[in-house]
């Protein structure tokens, strides 16, 4: 069992509506997998089940061979290993960029101030924002906020990073800087599970693409294969829709 | 005025223009300077717990000025009306001045009641409001019942229940040291307990609504980096919510300064109590209550000033009123 992440027949309902209808997939270390699919297909729910911001109804999720969906799993320990980047950034609004990054290091990992600061500054530099370390979120652009969000997740040294539509709240001209950071992470071997319709990123960085529709993975494969020879009707129509929406995209 | 900013770079509106700021600042310095000197004088320099304290300013010149102006007004006929009024001002001062030392002592208790009760009430209000917003059903219900019970009944009734209806008074009276020297007597302690409980309920409401105005994604993000729920509230939600709560909370402080006058009904010798007892003895109701009103006004304006400063010190770009851009 060398998979870093194994998702096994996960089901999740909200009331009467079943959002996830038996999802299974696995990721190796260093994989960059992208979940695509129409809105409401369960992509974000799937991500949130992995770090247990949402509790699954049935099925199992293994991180590094360990079942993390048991009742006695320490969710806070799990979340130390699984970072998350949010669509609307969710930077801690009262803290500077640097303190956004150090909070987890100080209060979760118990590092002292100097150590935390050193790590934070290294991560802020990695996303190109060391100069903005003392800025508050309200003083940053959307793209900068999201890069701080990535630095905050990276600082915890996670085994897996989850990205929940990291660029969809951004103005188009700010998408590039975030995608660039993500592509850098991918090339450095970070294991990433990404919900995104940013096809530029998918083509350049994704190992595999999972197409979700109506709570199921209807097709999976390398992006080039799926783009060129989509087998499933849903995949075809979805990718066509994306291409026209993004003006041809390559 | 050049544009001022706080330590964190949030712009602050310029405040009052220069000369009004100077006059206001002078008035505050005079009031607080006199008050503090009076307290120190009456406790340490000429301790005289029995009463009969001499005012710093003699009454004689004011009486004399009143006399002179009155006779001047008389001699001028209709033209003397302004002098008549001016004479009234001196008569008012002459009537008020002898009560100032007692009012200063009363103001001390008013300040103590307010500051101690608002602070202790805050300590209770934070967990209460967190319980209201983030607690389970049981906790939410307990917190809701408490706040509604306290906010739904008269403060005076609460004080009477505590003072006359429970053993609290006897219990506190038997605590060694109570009522000796600088330690206030049991009525003051009961009043502090009553105001603390009452204020906690109101403060909890202000903080509760501030908590709900913090975006839910903030706690989600805190949980996502591995913070527990309580830690997430402590380190992420509360620091923001308390900033949002400052304007409403300041209101509660101002109310409490004035509501503290209800302590007179359980025999606490605070500002209102001193005023009323002197007025009853001297029949100088106008002088006494107008002067007491000016005391309360000065206390309230001071509290507003302090809270404005607190708001400026704690301002963060993007949070709270002064942070809006």
What residue spans do the PLM features occupy?
Chain A
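C-terminal boundary and immediately downstream tail of ABC-type ATPase nucleotide-binding domains
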Residues: 224-250
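ABC family nucleotide-binding domain
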Residues: 3-5, 11-214, 218-223
């Amino acid at each position: 069992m060398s998979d870093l992440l194994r998702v096994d027949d996960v089901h999740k309902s909200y009331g009467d509506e079943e959002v996830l209808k038996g999802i299974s997939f696995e990721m190796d270390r260093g994989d960059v997998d992208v979940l695509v699919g129409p809105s409401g297909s369960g992509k974000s729910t799937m991500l949130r089940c992995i770090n247990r911001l949402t509790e699954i109804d049935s099925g199992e999720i293994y991180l590094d061979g360990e079942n993390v969906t048991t009742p006695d799993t320490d969710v806070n320990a799990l979340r130390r290993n699984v970072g998350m980047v949010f669509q609307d950034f969710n930077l801690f609004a009262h803290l500077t960029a640097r303190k956004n990054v150090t909070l987890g290091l100080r209060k979760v990992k118990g590092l002292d101030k100097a150590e935390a600061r050193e790590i934070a500054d290294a991560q802020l530099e990695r996303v190109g924002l060391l100069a903005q370390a003392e800025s508050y979120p309200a003083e940053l652009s959307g793209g900068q906020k999201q890069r701080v969000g990535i630095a905050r997740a990276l600082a915890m040294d996670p085994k897996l990073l989850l990205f929940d539509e990291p660029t969809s709240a951004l103005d188009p001209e700010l998408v590039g800087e975030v995608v660039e950071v993500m592509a850098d992470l991918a090339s450095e071997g970070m294991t990433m599970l990404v919900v995104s319709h940013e096809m530029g990123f998918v083509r350049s960085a994704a190992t595999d693409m999972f197409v979700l529709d109506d709570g199921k993975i209807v097709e999976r494969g390398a992006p080039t294969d799926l783009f060129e020879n989509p087998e499933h009707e849903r995949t075809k129509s979805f990718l066509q829709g994306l291409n026209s929406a993004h003006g041809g995209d390559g | 005025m050049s544009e001022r900013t706080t330590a964190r770079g949030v712009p602050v509106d310029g405040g009052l223009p220069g000369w009004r700021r100077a006059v206001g600042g002078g008035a505050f310095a005079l009031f607080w300077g006199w008050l503090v000197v009076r307290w120190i004088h009456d406790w340490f320099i000429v301790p005289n717990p029995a009463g009969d304290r001499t005012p710093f300013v003699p009454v004689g010149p004011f009486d004399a000025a009143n006399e002179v102006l009155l006779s001047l007004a008389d001699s001028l006929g209709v033209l003397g009306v302004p002098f008549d009024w001016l004479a009234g001002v001196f008569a008012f001062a002459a009537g008020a001045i002898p009560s100032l030392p007692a009012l200063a002592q009363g103001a001390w208790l008013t300040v103590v009641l307010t500051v101690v009760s608002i602070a202790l009430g805050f300590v209770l209000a934070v967990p209460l409001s967190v319980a209201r917003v983030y607690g389970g059903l049981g906790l939410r219900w307990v917190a809701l019942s408490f706040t509604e019970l306290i906010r739904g009944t008269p403060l005076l009734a609460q004080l009477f229940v505590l003072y006359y209806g429970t053993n609290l008074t006897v219990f506190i009276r038997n605590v060694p040291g109570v009522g000796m020297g600088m330690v206030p007597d049991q009525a003051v302690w009961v009043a502090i307990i009553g105001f603390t409980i009452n204020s906690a309920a109101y403060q909890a409401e202000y903080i509760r609504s501030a908590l709900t105005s913090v975006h839910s994604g903030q706690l989600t993000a805190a949980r996502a980096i591995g913070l527990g729920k309580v830690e997430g509230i402590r380190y992420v939600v509360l620091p923001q919510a308390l900033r949002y709560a400052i304007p409403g909370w300041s209101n509660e402080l101002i109310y409490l300064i004035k509501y503290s006058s209800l302590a007179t009904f359980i025999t606490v010798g605070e500002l209102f109590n001193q005023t009323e007892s002197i007025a009853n003895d001297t029949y100088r109701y106008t002088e006494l209550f107008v002067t007491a009103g000016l005391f309360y006004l000065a206390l309230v304006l001071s509290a507003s000033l302090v809270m404005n400063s607190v708001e400026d010190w704690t301002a963060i770009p993007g949070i709270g009123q002064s942070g809006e851009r």
